[in-house]
Each structure stands twice: as structure tokens, then as C-alpha cells.
Regions:
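Conserved alpha-helix/loop element of class I SAM-dependent methyltransferases that forms part
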Residues: 7-26
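Class I SAM-dependent methyltransferase SAM/SAH-binding core
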Residues: 29-31, 35-86
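A short glycine-rich, Lys/Arg-flanked "PGG" loop and its adjoining helix->strand segment in the class I
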Residues: 43, 111-126
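Short "lid" loop at the C-terminus of a central beta-strand within the Rossmann-like core
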Residues: 58-60, 84-85, 131-137, 170
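A short acidic, Gly/Pro-enriched loop at the edge of an enzyme's catalytic core
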Residues: 85-97
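Short catalytic micro-motifs in class I SAM-dependent methyltransferases
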Residues: 102-103
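Conserved class I S-adenosyl-L-methionine
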Residues: 126-154
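Core SAM-dependent methyltransferase catalytic element
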Residues: 158, 169-187
């Protein structure tokens, strides 16, 4: 892992996620957690009274995240390996925050994802999205024809209201680059 990413997981990521709205004691679902560039800083914020569900379909990423969790003695991260199916075994209204960071472009059935997120979130829960690879940010895959405004409207149509946008240095594929996070709340 490069030094920038290590610093990110130890400090800069923690500061950003606090700005985004993550707090001590929360239960968080990191959808597409990868090797934990967001799950690890989130775990440091929520502390021993909180819980992170780190979900991914990439077996290698899950193994690497498990190594990091063990090495850092993070007991509040629960790894969930999925086969890519959007059916996730979590209780309804049991999650405070859902992170969908740099993964939305890979989701074929976004409407199903939005419905699942809405189902899992508590009333007023935070749905935080980093829509990398949209029309204005390295276009590709399923978001290449959508602007952040289009994505905002799409998400709002599934029972969420827009809360705000946070821009800054974000983790993307083991490097840091400028990007923006869109925050929504469950109605």
C-alpha cells in the first residue's frame, strides 16, 4: 500500500468521513468496500459501540481487508462476501449510514440497489454516494452519460432527499484524487 493511502486510512479519510456525517456508535454498510479505504477510517470513527458491514464480491479484496482488520485489531468490522447479488441479509431499518463509494458505475441494476438501501436505512439515515466515472469525472461504464445532477435526481426518485455535497481528496483505486460525494437522507 502506498504512503498516501496509509495516511488516508489513518487520518485524512477519518476527517473526510466525519465531515460527511459519520459519527461514533453508528452502524454502517460499506457497499463495495474493496480493501477498506473507507471501511477502516469509518471503523475508527464509530468506535467500539459502532459496527461496519464491509460488503464486496471480490474475494481478493475481502482477503486483503481481513488482513488489515486483523493487523489493526479492528473488532467492529464485519466482512460480507457476496456473489454480486443485491439481496443482502440485513434487517430492515437497521443501518444508520450506507456508503456507495466509487462503485455505482459497476451496478447494473441501480434501481434495485436504491430500493435495498432505502429498506436497510433507519428513518433519516444517510445514503452517501461517490459517483466516480460519471459524465464529468472519468466517464465509463454505467454512468458515462449521467452528470452528478442526473444521478442526484435518480436517487431522489427512490425516497431520498438531497442533503449536500462534499468535495475534496478521495480514495480511488489505491490513489487519491479530487472528487465529490453526494449525501442523501431517507425520507
Amino acid at each position: 500500500m502506498n504512503d498516501d493511502i496509509e495516511k488516508w486510512e489513518r487520518g485524512n479519510g477519518v476527517r473526510l468521513l466525519k465531515k460527511v456525517g459519520i459519527e461514533s456508535g453508528q452502524t454502517i454498510l460499506d457497499f463495495g468496500a474493496g480493501v477498506g479505504h473507507y471501511a477502516i477510517p469509518a471503523a475508527k470513527i464509530v468506535g467500539s459501540n459502532g459496527l461496519i458491514y464491509a460488503l464486496d464480491s471480490d474475494k481478493h479484496a475481502i482477503k486483503e481487508l481481513q488482513r488489515k482488520v486483523t493487523r489493526q485489531e479492528l473488532e467492529n468490522i464485519k466482512l460480507i462476501e457476496t456473489d454480486g447479488n443485491l439481496e443482502i441479509d440485513l434487517e430492515n431499518s437497521s443501518i444508520d449510514v450506507v456508503l456507495v463509494y466509487d462503485i455505482l458505475h459497476l451496478v447494473d441494476r441501480r434501481e434495485e440497489l436504491y430500493k435495498q438501501v432505502h429498506q436497510f436505512l433507519r428513518q433519516g439515515g444517510l445514503f452517501s454516494v461517490y459517483p466516480k466515472h460519471n459524465k464529468l469525472d472519468s466517464p465509463g461504464w454505467g454512468l458515462e452519460n449521467m452528470t452528478p445532477q442526473d444521478i442526484k435526481k435518480e436517487i431522489e426518485s427512490y425516497g431520498f432527499y438531497f442533503e449536500g455535497r462534499y468535495c475534496g481528496l478521495l480514495s480511488h483505486d489505491n490513489i487519491l484524487n479530487q472528487g465529490c460525494i453526494l449525501n442523501f437522507r431517507k425520507k
